[in-house]
Amino acid sequence: MAISKIHSRYVYDSRGNPTVEVELTTEKGTFRSIVPSGASTGVHEALELRDGDKSKWLGKGVLKAVANVNDTIAPALIEANIDVADQAKIDEFLLKLDGTPNKAKLGANAILGVSLAAAKAGAAQKDVPLYKHIADISKAKEGKFVLPVPFQNVLNGGSHAGGDLAFQEFMIVPSGAPSFSEGLRIGSEVYHHLKSLTKKKYGQSAGNVGDEGGVAPDIKTAKEALDLIVSAIEAAGYTGQVDIAMDVASSEFYKDGLYDLDFKNPNSDKSKWITGPQLAELYEQLLNEYPIVSIEDPFAEDDWEAWSHFFSKVEGKTQIVGDDLTVTNPIRIKKAIETKAADALLLKVNQIGTLTESIQAANDSYAAGWGVMVSHRSGETEDTFIADLSVGIRSGQTKTGAPARSERLAKLNQILRIEEELGDKAIYAGKDFHKAHSL
């Protein structure tokens, strides 16, 4: 079935910045997608096209990207008359139309909006749910669907928060729950205990939430943050059922080959900056003391040596996730696999810019025995595509923020609906989240 109309406009994301929305029409109806945007972005990501006109939206307008959809992509794609259920063909057409390696001509945000809207239209054409269409495209293992463990970002530091804490995200991981819905309930209870403990210890305003719904108290060290989370898990009565994950986002505090854990202080003492191996020692201490099952971006995106050194020490003990390291880019993923730098991919569709390339990145990772964590961005919207993506590719783990703020809950609520719809045709990844694709 062909596409009859494509229309784009700008709408606003959860940080109040403009972003691209695309509506794609076929005989089956009109299908909408909204593109997210990140705060800490890797230098190797596909290009998100912003207008740069400082007189509007502080330079963050997306009028060019919207015009690229309406004036360039729409007429060309409609004329090409490609079957909307053939996602690979649509994405290939979009890539050729752009013609640059990083989607700089049309903008990854323009291309992705069309790619995701087409996937929704393709699912409707086949009369199947979006996650089933994605499973077909990705040639996922047949059998029961896998519902992901929700990694919930409950405490924020780094570039996502004020205070001195260098590490960006601390997540609770309800891997001991019997089902997704129970995992979400446990997460929400731990989160409420964490909020009240935080207010008690750091004052009322410390309960305010950051971009992704986590609390952002004025915490100095990772140990202090982890102690607070462990106390919340205990207070909720779930010790042993809830693990912890961290996203360090260490590229944000990598300077001159060293790591500055006091990077938010403009006068930080250079003599206290530490080397990759010293930072690795800090992680090893934390791994020994806390139930940490996953560490994302422990080192800077081009500090390959530090990644390989650390991974050789902790392989099999905890999952090491590449985000800024890999930026969902096949060339970077291949290098990370070959250098044994990590064993899991953080999958962000807007880092690469089409659904087909995102699925390819996941499949390349699975083939190497890696895990895949499907992720939101800090600038999110009400679009729930990544919920279906996570179920469709059997990722077994998803990162969509705290159980707070509607743009975060939109994804978690969508997985709740999928769980209900599938009933006994689905299993919860639980402790097997790292190898969920083969369950």
Swiss-Prot record:
Subcellular location: Cytoplasm
Cofactor(s) needed for function: Mg(2+)
Pathway(s) per entry: Carbohydrate degradation; glycolysis; pyruvate from D-glyceraldehyde 3-phosphate: step 4/5
Cofactor note: Mg(2+) is required for catalysis and for stabilizing the dimer.
Keywords: Allergen, Cytoplasm, Glycolysis, Lyase, Magnesium, Metal-binding
GO BP term, example: glycolytic process
Domain of life: Eukaryota
Active-site residue numbers: E212, K348
One Gene Ontology cellular component annotation held by this UniProt entry: phosphopyruvate hydratase complex
Reactions listed under catalytic activity: (2R)-2-phosphoglycerate = phosphoenolpyruvate + H2O
Nucleus in keyword set: no
Family from the record: Belongs to the enolase family.
This protein's name: Enolase
Taxonomic path: Eukaryota, Fungi, Dikarya, Basidiomycota, Pucciniomycotina
Gene that encodes the chain: ENO
